[in-house]
Amino acid sequence: MWLSDLQKIGVGTTALGFLFMIMGIFMFFDGPLLSLGNLLLVFGFFMIAGFSKSVSFFLRKDRMLGSISFFSGLLLTLFHFPIIGFFVECLGFFNLFKVFYPLIISFLRTVPYIGPYIDRLTSYQQSPV
């Protein structure tokens, strides 16, 4: 599947958002870098998925708590509370994408060097009895 020009710009915007977020974290939670990274991530996500799909993703009933905490963290970061906003935003991010964790773990099990460690962490030991 080929990406449209808008989706290609969205991928670049999302990558820049991750870069600015990482730079903001490394610079001791620098507020302007975190704010810029947040805005670029959200705009990139909207460009990749499209407006209607993004709105339906964030407004689903089972993801409402994650959406509220994610956008609350984004607003806290924008209003000069970067540390609190970052952690609230991370909580929202984990709640938004928690349905994808089994898929990510099953993919990581197939990666050659990471797979055995993931198997040790996620598999349980059955008792011999």
From Swiss-Prot:
Transmembrane segments: 9-29, 31-51, 68-88, 91-111
UniProt topological domain (Cytoplasmic) ranges: 1-8, 52-67, 112-129
A cellular-component GO term for this protein: COPII-coated ER to Golgi transport vesicle
Keyword Manganese applies: no
Ranges in the topological domain labelled Lumenal: 30, 89-90
Alphabetized InterPro entries for the sequence: Got1 (IPR045176), Vesicle_transpt_Got1/SFT2 (IPR007305)
Chief location of this protein within or outside the cell: Golgi
Topology within the bilayer: Multi-pass membrane protein
Record key words, sorted: Golgi apparatus, Membrane, Protein transport, Transmembrane, Transmembrane helix, Transport
One of the GO biological process terms: retrograde transport, endosome to Golgi
Keyword Protein transport listed: yes
Task performed by this protein: Nonessential protein required for the fusion of ER-derived transport vesicles with the Golgi complex. Can be replaced by sft2.
Family, similarity comment: Belongs to the GOT1 family.
Full protein name: Protein transport protein got1
Gene: got1
